[in-house]
Amino acid sequence: ISRSGVLKQSDKLDHIGVFGKTVEDVALLTKSLIKKDLYDSSTIHYSSDEMLKVCKKGPLYEPKFIFYKTKNWKNVDKESQKSFEFFIKTFKKNIEVFDTPSYFDDIPKYHKIIHETDMANNFQGYYKKSKKKLSKEMVGAIERGLKYSAKDYVEAMDFMKRSYESFKEVFEDYHGVLSPSTTGVAPKGLKSTGSPEFCTTWTYMGLPSISLPLLTGANNLPLGVQLIGDKLDDLRFLGVANWLEKNCKKYAK
């Protein structure tokens, strides 16, 4: 999906997301938005005509998933942990729980280098002219971004390629990867959208992900399960997401 016209923060990390009531709604909307755009070099010619049809059809056979609790599992609130454990138990025929690969430990560091360096480059005009109008968090990120060396940035970019090359073989044996979307239900108010710590790895590797509100957490609010797929495999990815959504509804009845 083209990012043309959107305020650029990081060319390597920025991506467009969509919202929908169901996975099929997401497929319909995405089908209309995926286009090659000469103004965004990250876009490609991608055949999306069959996206909704493939999404409705779902996987050819019952899917298999890896579930990563990750080292951030301790940050998930207790009630949400119980919901995820119930989800894993319910789909025990389909889900295998694994520890994350050791190289995942370095991804947040490298993601931060790219994110903050690009932010410093793209937002320098706002920083110079209107620093006092920016949030403390943004000012801090820009100032850190100005301090990284070219070596730091190149190393972070190189690790991005190597980490994906190491990880992509997972999708040869599994239909997708599952993890929490965040540490719990949506926080009250508009000051924060919650912690991004469960999304950083997938954003860094450029993998598509979708948050499915399949569970219930604190105060009976919806709790997101995150499904991650392989690059450029959006048709199958949305079909698998649709299967997961519909089968969760069956268990809920």
Locations of regions flagged by a protein language model:
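Structural helix-boundary/capping segments
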Residues: 1-71, 85, 148-158, 165, ...
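Active-site pocket-shaping loop/turn-to-helix segments
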Residues: 74-84, 109, 156
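Serine-dependent amide/ester hydrolase catalytic core
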Residues: 59-60, 73, 120-204
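Short Gly/Pro-enriched turn/cap motifs at secondary-structure boundaries
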Residues: 7-9, 55-57, 113-114, 172, ...
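Short glycine/threonine-rich loop-to-helix capping motif typified by GTGT followed
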Residues: 78-80, 108-117, 188-193
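Short helix-loop-beta junction
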Residues: 81-95
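Flexible, acidic loop-helix segments that line cofactor/substrate-binding pockets
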Residues: 41-48, 63-64, 68-71, 98-112, ...
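General small-molecule cofactor/ligand-binding pocket signal
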Residues: 94-101, 210
